[in-house]
Amino acid sequence: NAYPSLQLTLADNDDHVEYQVMDYLNQQPGGQCFYVENTLLPGLFALLFWPAIYAPVSGAFFHPFQSGPADLFRDYFARLREEEINAAFLALQNGSYADVIRTRFTQKQGISCPLIHWGWLSADVVEKALAVIPAAQLEAIFRHLLRDLKNHGRGLPDLIWLGDKPGEWKLIEVKGPGDRLQDHQKLWLEFFLQQGIAAE
């Protein structure tokens, strides 16, 4: 296993192993650990790229109750929305992204979107994530998501640890005894290693 790893021996309390590890990490001083899996990073992406997702592209919406565009998971999705996508990346580059995400988090709360699981996306985790995850790392993650929203929207690590200072954060994939990394989980871990993003 080429990925950084830590082995913990915990008393079994019948809780899911991910929650046991989260509780253990939250008993350590500094920072806070959250169970996020595939909810936080795709959720932040969707809030920032909302105008691109819901752009009035021909043929994307043909039913009033559609929660997302018909071509969201097609390889030409980004190509048809270049202007809106570039505007979102510009917000990351000029520092306005955090306010954009905060505003949309409030404005769009509860509106059905295929990339957002509102029940898992708390104001607390969004605020803490925006405070510590560097814009350049968010940009790298969002570009990776955009390359293949369908497949890259899964396989993200179970837990996120958010520290007290900018740049202090880590993604943690939890495996119980006999559990193995899936291919799509390995792809994300390899990507994080390449980008210098702490993950284990």
PLM features per residue range, with description:
Residues 149-152, 161:
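Acidic, glycine-rich flexible loop segments
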Residues 176-197:
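Mg2+/Mn2+-dependent nuclease catalytic core
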Residues 21, 44, 121-141, 158-163, ...:
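Conserved catalytic cores of phosphodiester-cleaving nucleases, focusing on short active-site segments
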Residues 134-138, 142-150, 195-198:
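Asparagine-biased alpha-helical interface segments
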Residues 67-70, 84-133:
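Non-catalytic regulatory appendages
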Residues 1-101:
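Nuclease-adjacent, charged terminal/linker segments that flank catalytic cores
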